[in-house]
Curated annotation (Swiss-Prot):
Its main location: membrane. Gene3D superfamilies: Glycogen Phosphorylase B. It is an enzyme of class 2 (transferase). It catalyses: di-trans,octa-cis-undecaprenyl diphospho-N-acetyl-alpha-D-muramoyl-L-alanyl-D-glutamyl-meso-2,6-diaminopimeloyl-D-alanyl-D-alanine + UDP-N-acetyl-alpha-D-glucosamine = di-trans,octa-cis-undecaprenyl diphospho-[N-acetyl-alpha-D-glucosaminyl-(1->4)]-N-acetyl-alpha-D-muramoyl-L-alanyl-D-glutamyl-meso-2,6-diaminopimeloyl-D-alanyl-D-alanine + UDP + H(+). One of its GO terms (molecular function) is UDP-N-acetyl-D-glucosamine:N-acetylmuramoyl-L-alanyl-D-glutamyl-meso-2,6-diaminopimelyl-D-alanyl-D-alanine-diphosphoundecaprenol 4-beta-N-acetylglucosaminlytransferase activity. Pathway: Cell wall biogenesis; peptidoglycan biosynthesis. UDP-N-acetyl-alpha-D-glucosamine binds at residues 10-12, 123, 159, 193, 240, 284. This is UDP-N-acetylglucosamine--N-acetylmuramyl-(pentapeptide) pyrophosphoryl-undecaprenol N-acetylglucosamine transferase. GO terms for biological process: carbohydrate metabolic process; cell division; cell wall organization; lipid glycosylation; peptidoglycan biosynthetic process; regulation of cell shape. Transmembrane segments: none annotated.
Length: 356
């Protein structure tokens, strides 16, 4: 059984692809390869997880008419040729895409080669590449209802290791790695792989009061941002590859509300303060609404996110054990069954039905 997954650029597109890839490999013995671009995180994440990566040209679709729009047909043609070659080289029997720059060429290549293909939309508002995939005949799979893309609701695929009981031995190892104090509650802050200027600024201004209140801060500032000086109770790092370890030590997470992030944080059972990215098609403002309504998280809009609003929300959660516990409980009960296995089973069944 040979499957190609397509999802590149950001972790939000790559992680669900890898979660399904692992389920296909581990449960069905499938040989799985990935499509990606040379400029995305997949260049490290995919090989690190044991999968072969095939690179194609990214095909970003301009949101406004400009010169890049005139180049789009040529970019699509080149990427389509590269995607077709990758599918032929791997002798793929099925394809699944997760949005992002590589998905549209993957869908078109699968269509042109007569391969079954699947389209997973993690966000509350579907992107253009995935809508195109379904229109081309792909099987639509939504994380939530009402995304604007046709298809069944299956949830978001996450790694199996992210769900389940907290591993205290793993937490101890993670604390040792980052120099964290076991006796202090930990606030984990991340703005994603590239970081967030607004989140970083507020955290750096708030950190002294947070530490004075008895907490410690693990702060992933982003690979391209200047690393602040560490000080007692404040542990800045450029980027964290092992998010599972960070979730394990976190008592509270402050982060953007990408669909994959929300799914992972919720599965980990950690209370969160979400700061939606105020760009794109507005999907981040919608992604966390279900868990917020369930009581598992709070939301502060980017325009309102300051040192003071961060301090106020953090103290309200961490200084009141009953509040913190109720949020954690709500997160655990909000987690649906892992979609990775469901999707892997669908792909495997489709391949088997075509070869019987």
């Amino acid at each position: 059984m040979r499957v190609v997954v397509a999802g590149g650029g950001t972790a939000g597109h790559i992680e669900p692809a890898l979660a399904v890839a692992e389920a296909l490999r581990d449960k069905h013995g499938a040989t799985v390869s990935a499509l990606g671009t040379a400029r995305g995180l997949e260049t490290t994440l995919v090989p690190d997880r044991g999968f072969e990566l095939h690179l194609i040209e990214p095909v970003p679709v301009p949101r406004k008419p400009n010169m890049d729009l005139l180049k789009l047909p040529f970019r699509v043609a080149k990427a389509l040729g590269q995607a077709r070659k990758a599918l032929k080289d791997t002798d793929a029997q099925a394809v699944i895409g997760f949005g992002g720059y590589v998905s549209a060429p993957a869908y078109m290549a699968a269509k042109s080669l007569g391969l079954p293909f699947f389209v997973h939309e993690a966000n509350a508002r579907a992107g253009m590449a995935n809508k195109l995939g379904v229109k081309l005949g792909g099987v639509g799979l939504n994380a939530v209802a009402g995304s604007g893309m046709e298809g069944d609701v299956v949830g978001i695929p996450i790694r199996a290791v992210l769900s389940g009981a907290r591993d205290e031995s793993a937490a101890d190892r993670a604390r040792d790695t980052w120099g964290l104090d076991k006796d202090r509650q930990t606030i984990f802050v991340t703005g994603g792989s590239q970081g967030s200027v607004s989140i970083n600024k507020a955290v750096e201004q708030a950190v002294d009061q947070l530490v004075e209140a008895g907490f410690q801060v693990l702060h992933a500032v982003g690979k391209k941002n200047e690393l602040p000086a560490a000080k007692p109770g404040y542990h800045p790092v450029p980027f964290i590859d092992d998010m599972q370890a960070a979730y394990t030590v976190a008592d509270l997470i402050v982060c953007r509300s990408g669909a994959m992030t929300v799914a992972e944080v919720t599965a980990a059972g950690v209370p969160a303060i979400y700061v939606p990215l105020p760009h794109g098609n507005g999907e981040q403002a919608l992604n966390a609404q279900a868990v917020i309504k369930a009581g598992a998280a709070r939301q502060i809009d980017d325009a309102d996110f300051t040192a003071q609003t961060l301090i106020d929300a953090t103290l309200d959660i961490l200084l009141h054990p009953s509040t913190h516990q109720s949020m954690s409980d709500a997160a655990k009960t909000s987690t649906a069954g892992n979609a990775s296995t469901v999707i892997a089973d669908m792909i495997a069944a489709t391949i088997k039905s075509q070869h019987n």
